[in-house]
Amino acid sequence: MQDVLLQVQAVSKSYHDGDVTTQVLTEVDLQVFKGEQLAIVGTSGSGKSTLLHIMGTLDKPSAGKVLLAGEDLYQVSSARQAQIRNQDLGFIYQFHHLLPEFSALENVAMPAFIQGRDRTQAQADAKVLLERVGLGHRMSHIPAELSGGERQRVAIARALINKPKLVLADEPTGNLDAKSGEAVYELIRELANQLGTAFVVVTHDPKLAARMDRQLTMKNGYLQAVAEHAQ
């Protein structure tokens, strides 16, 4: 029996603008298992990114619960939420959000610095991760000196520096060409298998999503279909 890492229970989300209410998510239920690679596919505006943000405590649900390792993420203090984001969750975005004035090594180590870890050890861990993502020769380069695919690899390494239980990736290949995007997905699969980290990846590309262990389809705020894939 698989161990459940994250549970989304009857989560709904709506936005209000005067008399107008926009329903984005409707009673979404979801389980993410330890170490699995889960893809959520859907068209733009289907609610998939909103769900990912709620899973990562970046947006509050209008109703429902989100539990990570049994802890209700919306029944804890904002300080505890920040601690969870830094220690237990990793984030990868379509646009890498690397700090432009810092090297690849410093960008990867930054979450560990924020956590208060020893700087020498944090940089040593960052070096190992950069080597693991194939950038051992680019550690001293700033983002402007890296290609789009290389910058996204740095972002993946940064997401893993604090050894999170779960990494949430929002369109991680959306800003890359097909070849670079495919390489990023292969890297995610490889790292998930090596490190035992769970990944939830939001994408509009069903071909890339099909590489993951499991696939859910989001349509009009509902999770509609599940497809199983060979390992």
From Swiss-Prot:
Protein name: Lipoprotein-releasing system ATP-binding protein LolD
Lineage top rank: taxon: Bacteria
Chain residues that bind ATP: 42-49
Ranges annotated as spanning the membrane: none
Lineage summary: Bacteria, Pseudomonadati, Pseudomonadota, Gammaproteobacteria, Alteromonadales
Location of the ABC transporter domain: 6-231
Membrane-topology annotation of the record: Peripheral membrane protein
GO CC annotations on file: plasma membrane
Gene3D superfamilies listed in its UniProt record: P-loop containing nucleotide triphosphate hydrolases
Cross-referenced Pfam families: ABC_tran (PF00005)
Keywords assigned by UniProt, alphabetized: ATP-binding, Cell inner membrane, Cell membrane, Membrane, Nucleotide-binding, Translocase, Transport
Subunit comment: The complex is composed of two ATP-binding proteins (LolD) and two transmembrane proteins (LolC and LolE).
Gene Ontology biological-process annotations: lipoprotein localization to outer membrane; protein localization to outer membrane
PROSITE patterns, alphabetized: ABC_TRANSPORTER_1, ABC_TRANSPORTER_2, LOLD
Family statement drawn from the similarity comment of this UniProt entry: Belongs to the ABC transporter superfamily. Lipoprotein translocase (TC 3.A.1.125) family.
Annotated InterPro entries: AAA+_ATPase, ABC_transporter-like_ATP-bd, ABC_transporter-like_CS, ABC_transpr_LolD-like, LolD_lipo_ATP-bd, MacB-like_ATP-bd, P-loop_NTPase
One annotated GO molecular function: ATP binding
Compartment list: Cell inner membrane
Gene assigned in the entry: lolD
